[in-house]
Every structure is written in structure tokens, then in C-alpha cells.
Design a protein with these regions (language model features):
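Conserved SAM/SAH cofactor-binding pocket of Class I
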Residues: 60-151, 157
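A structural micro-motif
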Residues: 16, 95, 120-122, 168, ...
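Class I SAM-dependent transferase core
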Residues: 4-69, 116, 120
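Single conserved hydrophobic/aromatic residue that forms the stacking wall/gate
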Residues: 220-229
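C-terminal substrate-binding/active-site "lid" region of AdoMet-derived donor-dependent transferases
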Residues: 169-203, 215
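Helix-to-beta-strand junctions that scaffold the AdoMet/dcAdoMet cofactor pocket
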Residues: 164-165
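Short hydrophobic/aromatic beta-strand or adjacent loop that forms the aromatic wall/cage
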Residues: 209-213
Length: 229
């Protein structure tokens, strides 16, 4: 798996800009994922090549698509098995990463994996996005918020934009067949203070797959009620 990831990072032009042990850590993460997947439903992908390409390199492909240079904090909403938040942490260790998931057992596993990989500045927490958005310590707090196809873009924007700082960005990983979603989400994004800054389609190295990254900038804090508890 390490060789597939390493060659994929090279194909993406990332070899010199990510830590030298990034491929090794991503491969170890993939190994731990497949091992745990035998007793916990974490991914439908059950082979090393699929995990390398459709999980690790899919997330790594975000780096050429978006500017991460000024970002210091990242929240991954509906992280599941940790995508894309944990690979981004491995590739960009300067990021302070929070992984949000609704299931305690996944959260516990993600914290265990982070420790096994020797990562610091990353935590997994349990909760639902619509509830955590009411928490003063999390609302309007992150430079970047990510989500990987956990819902349609309109709903994702409503769930994710409340966490973004003004001037920050929401990065939504979608399929290339999401044009209708984009159209349907436009009004909600505007009401929430956002604007679609860019839509980038990208190929995953070694896979005959193209995915899409929708980049939404937050221009001002949403006027809709988001009172803290």
C-alpha cells in the first residue's frame, strides 16, 4: 500500500511538500482501517489498493485544489472512518484537526489510531453537527471545514457553514454529477453568508475516477439564529 500511495503523491506533485513519512503513515492508517473493518463497519472498500487510491489519494488530491497555506484549524464533519480529516492531518501536520462523528465507537477508534500514528494536534469528538453548531467553543471557529459526500450540498452547507470563521472556507467533496446539487444549494449558501468560490474536478492517481471539490467561502456570519446554549 505504501508504494501505491507514494507513487500517487508523486503524481499529484506533492512529494516535496508533504512530510517524508507521509506515505508510510497513510499506509499504516490504511492497514489499521482494514484490520478494524473486520469487526466494525468503517468502509465498503476492503482491499489495499482501493483504500490507497479511493481513500488516501482521494483526500491527498485536495491539496492541489485548495490553498491550505494560511489554515491552522480544520473541522471534519461526519468524518466516519476519518476522511478527509485524518489524511489531511498526516499530509499537513501544522493543522489542528477536529474530527466530528455521531458514533462513539468510531470516535474512540479514531483517537486510538491518531495515538498509534504518533499524531498530535488532532482529536475526535462525538456529536451531531446541528447540535455542536450551537456550542460557542465551536461555532465560527475554524479556518477550514470539510465534509465528504455525507449529504446533499444544501444540507451540508447548513450543517457546516456555522462552524466556519468569516474569511474561512468550507470544502465539500462531491461527485462530478453534482451540478443539480450546486444549483439547489446556491440560495442556502447565500443566506448563510457564503459564496461558491470555485468548483474543481480532479482525477485520483491510479484510478479511473474523477471527483469534485466545491469550495465555499464565508463572507459574513449568518444572520439566522445560531444562539449558544
Amino acid at each position: 500500500m505504501k508504494e501505491l500511495i507514494s507513487s500517487g503523491l508523486e503524481a499529484l506533485g506533492l512529494t516535496g511538500s508533504v512530510p517524508p513519512d507521509a506515505a508510510e503513515k497513510l499506509a499504516e492508517y490504511g492497514r489499521l482501517l482494514l484490520e478494524k473493518n473486520q469487526v466494525m463497519n468503517l468502509t465498503a472498500i476492503r482491499d489495499e489498493a482501493g483504500v490507497a487510491r479511493l481513500h488516501m489519494l482521494d483526500c491527498a488530491a485536495l491539496l492541489p485544489c485548495a490553498d491550505f497555506s494560511q489554515a491552522r484549524t480544520l473541522l471534519d464533519v461526519g468524518t466516519g472512518a476519518g476522511f478527509p480529516g485524518l489524511p489531511l492531518k498526516i499530509l499537513l501536520p501544522q493543522l489542528d484537526v477536529t474530527l466530528l462523528d455521531s458514533l462513539n465507537k468510531r470516535v474512540d477508534w479514531l483517537n486510538e489510531v491518531s495515538a498509534q500514528l504518533g499524531l498530535t494536534g488532532v482529536r475526535a469528538i462525538q456529536g451531531r453537527a446541528e447540535e455542536k453548531a450551537l456550542d460557542k467553543s465551536m461555532r465560527d471557529s475554524f479556518d477550514l471545514v470539510t465534509a465528504r459526500a455525507v449529504a446533499d450540498l444544501r444540507l451540508l452547507s447548513e450543517l457546516c457553514l456555522p462552524f466556519v470563521k468569516v474569511g474561512g472556507r468550507f470544502l465539500s467533496m462531491k461527485s462530478v454529477d453534482s451540478d443539480q446539487e450546486l444549483d439547489q444549494a446556491a440560495h442556502a449558501i447565500k443566506l448563510l453568508g457564503g459564496r461558491v468560490r470555485d468548483v474543481k474536478d480532479y482525477a485520483i492517481p491510479g484510478a479511473d475516477v474523477t471527483h469534485r471539490l466545491v469550495i465555499v467561502c464565508l463572507l459574513y456570519t449568518s444572520p439566522s439564529p445560531r444562539d449558544t446554549r
